[in-house]
Curated annotation (Swiss-Prot):
GO cellular component: cytoplasm
Endoplasmic reticulum in keyword set: no
Start-end of RG C-terminal-type zinc fingers: 117-143
EC identifiers of the protein: 5.6.2.-
Notes concerning its domains: Introduction of positive supercoils requires the cooperation of both the helicase-like and topoisomerase domains of the 2 subunits. The helicase-like domain probably does not directly unwind DNA, but more likely acts by driving ATP-dependent conformational changes within the whole enzyme.
The protein, known as: Reverse gyrase subunit A
Lineage: Archaea, Nanobdellota, Candidatus Nanoarchaeia, Nanoarchaeales, Nanoarchaeaceae
Pfam family, one: Topoisom_bac
Organism: Nanoarchaeum equitans (strain Kin4-M)
GO biological process: DNA topological change
Homology family: Belongs to the type IA topoisomerase family.
Length: 701
């Protein structure tokens, strides 16, 4: 196997520069056209500017074109002339215009309406449809429409368009959006999928192109529509109940909030007295249900058991296990950790970080072998694939470079990365050590169990007291339990009141989401972040505490819509989305079930909601007072949109009518008068007069 120090970097750089000069000559027309015809002009579209810059530098120093505020990197692989440009994430979001039901039309099938995303450059707020920021009023806006125009212009210059967005359902949706907007300008559009940003992976992706995976796209559409229909509808109920439009609800968000609240209730019920007893050599913590009146001056340690055991390494990181460890060891939020991991991926330092697989490829094993044999010796290398090959690998480094070497290469300019911080380095170190340990042999440990006795209290202490034979502990050192049998003088005692049931950390919540099957690698951090943003929970000493607002919101949602935010239903729903992604389930059937749930939300009795009114029109005859108002408003010659509340406006947009006055009037009548409809007796003499109005309701239903 070729070692890193054996690679002639100068020769490789020279070859790349020669290839680049050759392509420049081709473009100037100085090389025969038969050679020129063999080289394809490729527009390579990725998500982030970081990734675009990293990829461009794999093939020599790129030239840069600036088109508006978009950078396009131009380079060559020898076979392709690449123009690499970034979408900067999603281009479209469901419209907030009053189109259909929350931006989804019902024709033969459900048709979501998307609008280009806009971002305020002053306050960072993201929105659609408005011409200025709805939060701060700024007109300093980054509009995805500008990027769409650039992509279309560049597509016309290319022979082939390759879309290299992230290798998951969300990335596939972005790829589909890009495909849709440039299809009229270039017919040769394909998907390029890679799971690490390395030269080798990019070259492989360019050669193994495929079509868009429409099943992945359908799954992502279902996720988005479900969030808009159910999440938005539940959120609107919260706005009405609590008079605050910053509140939100969702299938996953609400059960997770419930986990935290229930844990907090258990925490309060299991209060106890804690005593940290300190000697000159160690500290032991005891728990008592009642306070102690006096303390012993000594503590006694008795050995219970000692045994030799083989300690195998843990598998390499998945998203949830990385978040769990990084929260504890780096003391960072899950949102921050995912942002750092995204950077490491885009810089080509780690593989894709949204994964639930522990599998390691042959290439990954070779990377581990190179490092382990050079650093510790061949006898410590113990290769493992860690499960069957799937869509993704585990999270691992892309090169046999440890943290010390990485820092050295950054300082000497061998690796050039803009914006890398100590936090990035610490996270990389965590990933690197876990991965290398997973490919090393077990170590042999001496485990010892002790009983500690003090002031009539007992507690068990156990841990590793010695290493008999080294293994993966060389890359992940083990802290030994420094305690021995004997009687020791107590030099200090600290007392506090705590709980036998600890509050959850962010790491615990991620683990619960994984266990209950209500989260995915792409959603773990987002869900936790929302709970903080809505002020449903706060964090104290890394422990999660529900706020009064969070408790009230959860009580309200579970009392009225408990079955819709149930853990089991949420898990079943996510399983259905997985089946859609695998082509095993029709996504339209799932959307139809969502529509039924949406109507169920509307039909709750607390306020004047759309479906209440609609169903009462069907159930009762319309009294004269309603018809008279309807007839009077019909005589107007102008529509007054300001009369429409959010609910009547939603009905107005859903009505399949051409007459604006009729639409507005019926919408107002349904919302304003449904209570009258339930209380007034049937007035049969008016039946013929209001028959037309009933027919309009029938059309809506």
């Amino acid at each position: 196997m070729l070692r890193l120090e054996e690679i002639d970097l100068d020769t490789i750089k020279k070859e790349l520069d020669e290839e680049r000069k050759k392509v420049e000559e081709i473009m100037k027309g100085n090389i025969p056209t038969e050679i020129k015809d063999l080289i394809k002009m490729v527009l390579f579209i990725v998500e982030s500017p970081n990734k675009a810059r990293t990829i461009a530098n794999f093939f020599g120093k790129p030239s840069v074109r600036r088109i508006g505020n978009i950078k396009a990197y131009e380079t060559t692989t020898g076979k392709y002339i690449l123009t690499i440009v970034a979408t900067k994430g999603h281009l479209f979001e469901l419209t907030l215009k009053e189109e259909g039901v929350y931006g989804v039309l019902k024709e033969k099938e459900y048709v979501p309406i998307f609008s280009p995303i806009k971002k305020c450059l002053d306050c960072g707020h993201q929105f659609v449809d408005e011409d200025k920021c709805p939060r701060c009023g700024s007109e300093n806006i980054d509009d995805a429409s500008d990027r769409i125009k650039v992509l279309r212009d560049l597509a016309q210059e290319a022979d082939i368009v390759l879309i290299g967005t992230d290798p998951d359902a969300e990335g596939e949706k972005i790829a589909y959006d890009v495909y849709s907007i440039i299809r009229p300008y270039n017919k040769n559009i394909y998907r390029a999928e890679f799971h690490e940003v390395t030269r080798q992976a990019i070259i492989k992706a360019l050669e193994e192109i495929r079509d868009i995976n429409t099943n992945r796209v359908k799954a992502q559409l279902v996720r988005r529509i479900e969030d808009r229909w159910i999440g938005f509808a539940l959120s609107q109920r919260l706005w009405s109940r609590f008079k605050k439009k910053t509140l939100s609800a969702g299938r996953v968000q609400t059960p997770v909030l419930g986990f935290i609240i229930k844990r907090y209730e258990e925490y309060k019920k299991n209060r106890a007295h804690y005593y940290a007893v300190k000697t000159s050599d160690f500290e032991v913590t005891f728990i008592s249900d009642d306070p102690l009146e006096k303390y012993d001056k000594t503590i006694k340690i008795e050995k219970i058991e000692e045994k030799e055991s083989e300690k195998k390494p843990l598998p390499p990181y998945t998203t949830d296990s990385l978040l769990r460890d990084a929260v504890i060891e780096l003391r960072l939020s899950v949102d921050k950790i995912m942002a750092l991991a995204q950077n490491l991926f885009e810089w080509g330092l780690i593989t894709y970080h949204r994964t639930d697989s522990t599998h390691i490829s042959n290439l990954g094993i070779q990377i581990a072998q190179t490092y382990i044999e050079n650093t510790f010796g061949k006898e410590y290398f113990y290769p493992r694939h860690w499960g069957e090959e799937g869509t993704h690998e585990a999270i691992r480094p892309t090169k046999p470079i440890d943290t010390e070497t990485l820092i050295k290469m950054l300082r000497e300019g061998d690796i050039q990365i803009q914006g890398i911080t100590k936090e990035h380095i610490r996270l990389y170190d965590l990933i690197f050590r876990r991965f290398i340990a997973s490919q090393m042999k077990p170590f042999i440990a001496i485990e010892t169990k002790f009983n500690a006795v003090w002031s009539n209290l007992n507690t068990t202490i156990e841990g590793i007291t010695d290493i008999k034979e080294n293994g993966w502990n060389l890359i992940k050192p083990i802290k030994l339990l420094a305690i021995k049998e004997g009687e020791y003088e107590v030099i200090d005692v600290k007392h506090w009141i705590g709980s036998k049931v600890p509050l959850y950390t962010q790491a615990d919540v991620i683990e619960l989401m994984k266990e209950q099957n209500i989260g995915r690698p792409s959603t773990y951090a987002t869900i936790v972040k929302k709970l903080f943003e809505r002020y449903y929970v706060i964090e104290k000493n890394q422990r999660l505490i529900p706020t009064e607002r969070g408790i009230k919101v959860y009580q309200y949602l579970t009392e009225r819509f408990g079955h819709l935010v149930d853990v089991k239903l949420t898990a079943d729903l996510l399983e259905k989305m997985d089946r859609i992604e695998n082509g095993e389930l029709d996504y339209m059937d799932v959307l139809r079930s969502f529509k039924k749930e949406l109507i169920e939300i509307w039909k709750t009795k607390e306020t004047k909601y759309i479906a209440d009114g609609i169903y009462k029109w069907k159930e009762y005859s319309v009294p004269a007072i309603v018809y008279e108002r309807y007839e009077k408003i019909l005589k107007r010659k102008k529509v007054y949109p300001e009369y429409l509340t959010p609910w009547s406006r939603a009905i107005y947009n859903a009505l399949p009518l051409d007459n604006e006055i009729e639409k507005q009037t019926l919408a107002l009548a349904i919302e304003k008068d449904f209570e009258i409809l339930t209380k007034k007796p049937i007035l049969r003499e008016y039946k013929k007069k209001y028959e037309h109005l009933k027919n309009l309701v029938d059309q809506l239903l």
